[in-house]
Amino acid sequence: MLRRDFLKYSVALGVASALPLWSRAAFAAERPALPIPDLLTADASNRMQLIVKAGQSTFAGKNATTWGYNGNLLGPAVQLHKGKSVTVDIHNQLAEDTTLHWHGLEIPGIVDGGPQGIIPAGGTRTVTFTPQQRAATCWIHPHKHGKTGRQVAMGLAGLVLIEDDEIRKLRLPKQWGIDDVPVIIQDKRFSADGQIDYQLDIMTAAVGWFGDTLLTNGAIYPQHSAPKGWLRLRLLNGCNARSLNIAASDNRPLYVIASDGGLLAEPVKVTELPLLMGERFEVLVDISDGKAFDLVTLPVSQMGMAIAPFDKPHPVMRIQPLRITASGTLPDTLTTMPALPSLEGLTVRNLKLSMDPRLDMMGMQMLMKKYGAQAMSGMDHDSMNAHMQGGNMGHGEMDHGNMDHSGMNHGAMGNMNHGGKFDFHNANFINGQVFDMNKPMFAAQKGRHERWVISGVGDMMLHPFHIHGTQFRILSENGKAPAAHRTGWKDTVRVEGGISEVLVKFDHDAPKEHAYMAHCHLLEHEDTGMMLGFTV
């Protein structure tokens, strides 16, 4: 053995022995390099092209049909600039209709890309808009009603990077794909022949579609080699239904610098970072010690999501520091957050999220039959028992006093427990109603703050609630003050058996034909009715 090979081998053994057992097991296998999406920028005429297409990808040695934007799987990182208009031609080369939603962007309803913004098979849709919001990491994904879950599962997702003058002045890591790294995390389930195995059925309508394989930027357990110093990770939970809890395998801290809608006032130090479906957080991690480690997701208490291999810490990616050092820094302060306005006299909208108890019961039975007791591991047994006794349709906890009742179908709320043909495609509700594309639930006033009270009381399911056309502030989350890293600009809030309140404002028009959406971002809940439209 040559001396240099011996040294390299010794170093590798040293690195491997420093890692936990579940990580070391895979050390011998050659890991792929973390795929880095290309940056897509507008041309000289402020125009860009996105092509929605089918392709082929390889997972664990088997070829699978996948869908992507401008490629086989996922898509480019679309780069936008605050105050600069852009025109995007979206060409749909799939054999079915789709839409393209700009998740997190504050743009008019007509270009938002919700379920009304259909791009027919073989067709093209052109949108023009001017981002006026602060720098943020957002994303694109399809929003075809009833098909969103499947189209995302097939691979349609990509990042959107909004830049502004303020963030350019900060000395954050900003070398794309080197020390400024996108991390799109998704789980997949594959059939025996290697194809993506998506089903919308009673079980998935209840708990969501989840897989047993974790992909990071479309690759299984990849490695990223980065310069020593500060490493910036732009995290996106792109899963259909799985919440994540991100940590470093050696417990080194993560410094959260931005949430869905942009920079926090100052970095927030955490050792665990819960990440709901559709959420983005930007974190900085110090890798100046030169030691390799894994980014992992820790087990969560969400129903069905602690089934092996997710019953223990699961690697997302390996981070391998290089000998060279990068120049990015972690600033002490990042931006100035505006003070919250007075809540006196604001319009209050009460939204109640619920599930047809027949779907609830049958979905849970199917989950238990397929996976056994492990399906419920980590769950709170008291709330589970109350849930199993039919508690999830109670209405007593709703505050009717100052409620906007205009969109509520009381007949449906009273009757959905009884009789009627059961259709799991229409078995998830907001205020007792399934989504109706032709009937917006209410009209919000442009430029005025509103307080939205979103209740999941009586329902133990996790509902990451997403609102289009705005970046809001969380007033309370499941009855508690928001965690420090969740006090910034957000477009998604956790609703899980409790009540969450957000302060929203809409600065763009959304007419009936292109209403904004508000919905659960567990995609199978959204696809089976837990969504509403509203106008501005």
Curated annotation (Swiss-Prot):
Its EC number is 1.16.3.4. Transmembrane segments: none annotated. Cu cation 1 binds at H101, H466. One of its GO terms (molecular function) is oxidoreductase activity. Keywords: Copper, Metal-binding, Oxidoreductase, Periplasm, Repeat, Signal. Residues 53-165, 229-295, 424-536 form the Plastocyanin-like domain. Binds 4 Cu cations per monomer. PROSITE patterns: MULTICOPPER_OXIDASE2 (PS00080), TAT (PS51318). Cu cation 3 binds at H143, H468, H519. It holds the Pfam family Cu-oxidase_3. Residues 1-28 form the signal peptide. One of its GO terms (cellular component) is periplasmic space. It is found in: Periplasm. Predicted to be exported by the Tat system. The position of the signal peptide cleavage has not been experimentally proven. Its cofactor is Cu cation. Cu cation 4 binds at H463, C520, H525. It catalyses: 4 Cu(+) + O2 + 4 H(+) = 4 Cu(2+) + 2 H2O. Cu cation 2 binds at H103, H141, H521. Multicopper oxidase involved in copper homeostasis and copper tolerance under aerobic conditions. Is responsible for the oxidation of Cu(+) to the less harmful Cu(2+) in the periplasm, thereby preventing Cu(+) from entering the cytoplasm. NCBIfam families: PRK10965.1. Belongs to the multicopper oxidase family. This is Multicopper oxidase CueO. It comes from Salmonella typhi. The gene is cueO.
